[in-house]
Amino acid sequence: MPTSHPLTLLLRPHDILFFRDSRPMAGASAGHGDRFPFPHVLNSALHAACHRAFPTDSPVAYTHARASASKQRDSQRTERFGSLRTVGPFPVAEDGRWFFPKPGDLLDPRSGPVILPFEASDFPGHSSLPEPLQPLGSHVQAGKSTFPQWMDRAAFTAYLHGQVIESSGLAHNDSFFVTEESLGIGMNPDTGTTNEGQIYSRRQLRFREGCQLGVLTETGNQHQKEEDLLEQLFPEDGWIRVGGEGRVCQVTKASKQPSALLPTGPAIRGNRVKWVLLSPAIFPQLAASDKNRPHPGGWLPTWVDAETMQVQLMDGPGPNKARRLGVEPGSPVSAKLIAARVERYVPVAGWTNPSEGETGTGKEGARSTLLAVPAGTVYYFETASEEEAQRLANALNWHGQPGSGTITNRRSTLLGEKGYGIGVCAPYETL
């Protein structure tokens, strides 16, 4: 079985943080750097810290377990630290509580989930939705008050169990951070002087005193016997550069494991399952191949058939992975997607710095912008039985089966190892 080294890190910013999106910082466009950091930002920061701490001649490599020898020979670079996996960041209050994005089916703090699928029989006429998708509705009139953006673990657990959500477990963005605006002037990197007329504005995040970023990390796999990578990187409390301009955060190691920090899914009663995203997910468009039909991606998970909406997941590892792990392979789950509550997409971009010997190879520069489904998105599924519904929940829950405390499932097609596609399941009722 895999040898995993879980570690929980708390990052306390010592200054403003800047997390810009893919929009240019020129003309009338302000530098939108005041958004909460995406999962890949912290993962990249840890990777960069590992590269600085363990140079290329270091015996600590942690290459990707599935990187074959032929691929490494053909590549100009080594996939160092490929076993590093992260979940988060999430805001952590001064009292140590972790907070998570509000599910999209909540409208009012005083009520539970109110946005639900209609029964198909309620709409016997024509619908623009392809079968078997059903419209969503609410039995509560939307008010002017806005639901807080964050819920702590206790409030999220109450939501998953259909219980009353205590207001003490809810928080707005300004409970953790505020936006600051500033002006800057463009610099010439060759001369180190300013560029005349290149003035820009930007927005940044300043965290409240005592508030932190919480990140769950894992390193190691069944092929590696080394000591934990991050334990070597942070033998005691340390420092790390995060986001644009390399702003510094103090790093503290925490003892709590994922099962004590992340909300876990309850046992499923009935044949309906909803999957709530705790982090964004990326489902790219897929071209047709010999084995698969084309898939539009976007809001629709690539593991859902685009024509029938049938789920194409297994309740355990696939044949190849099961062979590597020495366990029994899973069996297909029979379920279909019937509705989804999806807010506006969020752009995911980045920048690749060249490694030694790669300058001028085209591997450096801006990465392609990806469009992600935001955290808080809710997907609604139906199955033929309660047993099948629980199997679906086991395939979608971040922890797999009930009672498990390990991070098992990352259901984003891209960047799952960086913390995308982390979700939790619960039963639901129709209107």
Predicted regions and their residues:
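Conserved active-site/ligand-binding neighborhood in enzyme cores
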Residues: M1-L431
